[in-house]
Design a protein with these regions (language model features):
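Second-shell loop/turn segments in exported
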Residues: 24, 42, 46, 53-58, ...
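Acidic/His- and Gly-rich active-site-bordering loop/insert found
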Residues: 3, 8, 14-18, 39, ...
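Structural recognition of the beta-strand scaffold that forms the well-ordered cores
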Residues: 9-10, 55-57, 76-80, 112-117, ...
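Noncatalytic luminal/extracellular "stalk/propeptide" segments of secretory-pathway proteins
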Residues: 1-76, 80-88
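A conserved hydrophobic secondary-structure block that centers on an alpha-helix together
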Residues: 60-122
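Alpha-helical metal-binding/catalytic segments enriched in His/Glu/Asp
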Residues: 98-99, 103, 187, 203-236
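Long, well-ordered, tryptophan-enriched scaffold segments
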Residues: 108, 112, 134-186
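Solvent-exposed loop/turn segments at secondary-structure junctions
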Residues: 14-18, 62-63, 83-86, 119-123, ...
Length: 236
């Protein structure tokens, strides 16, 4: 309204809602170590007592896809699928598949849970969350992302342990839950044209920030840019 748009309003809509709970991860054998982790959107829960199992390593999403059916029964799949650094960040879409599809594939292979390397290239211990999808008929499993330093540490542990025939075991505690339907809304504003019969031009952006971030980049900046573009049209 302060920018001068007309008929500014909120269009409510219902949406299924998932909320995260407690989150922790630690390697219990053979090299005990706590790790930084966060649940992926739509992850199932391990239960309050958590889940401890052997970790099976896959370098890429394709390697996970090639695993024999049932080969991961009762185990935790770990997929690295290291994202390539680019100036524009364009590789995010390509490497995001491990987050979107990996948990569903692991569930179909019989895995008890899955952890992935965070999709990103920054070396800090803030794991990167995001949504994941499970195909119809596939029961969701606990699914989470490790911070990049922790994912690389886990890779080193697995490589070292394999030389002596040891299995790496991890304990996960993830307690997210689905809380049913809640209400959100689209913010709509209009710039009346000079000819009502000429049709409508739609300018828009989305704000789908996850709870762990501010949404400044995805997509607060984009919303601000599109709003400014619409104002330029209005003021022309």
């Amino acid at each position: 309204k302060a920018m001068g748009f007309s008929n500014v309003r909120i269009e409510p809509f219902d949406m299924k809602t998932w909320v995260r709970g407690e989150e922790s991860a630690e390697v219990t054998a053979p090299y005990p170590a706590k790790m930084h982790i966060t649940a992926l959107g739509n992850s199932a829960s391990t239960g309050d007592k958590g889940l401890e199992a052997e970790v099976v390593y896959f370098r890429t999403l394709a390697d996970l896809q090639a695993a024999p059916a049932g080969s991961l029964k009762g185990k935790i799949a770990f997929v690295s699928h290291k994202m390539t650094r680019t100036q524009s960040g364009a590789s995010y879409g390509q490497f995001g598949g491990v987050r979107r599809a990996g948990p569903g594939i692991a569930a179909q292979k019989g895995a008890a849970a899955i952890v992935i390397r965070s999709v990103g290239t920054d070396y800090h211990r803030n794991p990167h969350t995001g949504g994941t999808n499970f195909p119809d008929g596939v029961t969701p499993i606990p699914s989470a992302a490790l911070s990049i330093p922790d994912a690389e540490n886990l890779e080193r542990m697995i490589a070292r342990a394999s030389k002596s025939g040891q299995a790496v075991k991890m304990k996960l505690v993830l307690t997210p839950r689905q809380i049913g339907t809640t209400q959100s809304g689209n913010v709509i504003a209009e710039v009346p044209g000079s000819d009502p019969q000429a049709g409508t031009i739609l300018v828009g952006g989305h704000l789908d920030s996850w709870d762990l971030g501010t949404g400044a980049i995805d997509d607060g900046a984009g919303v601000a840019i599109t709003a400014a573009a619409a104002k330029l049209i209005m003021d022309a």
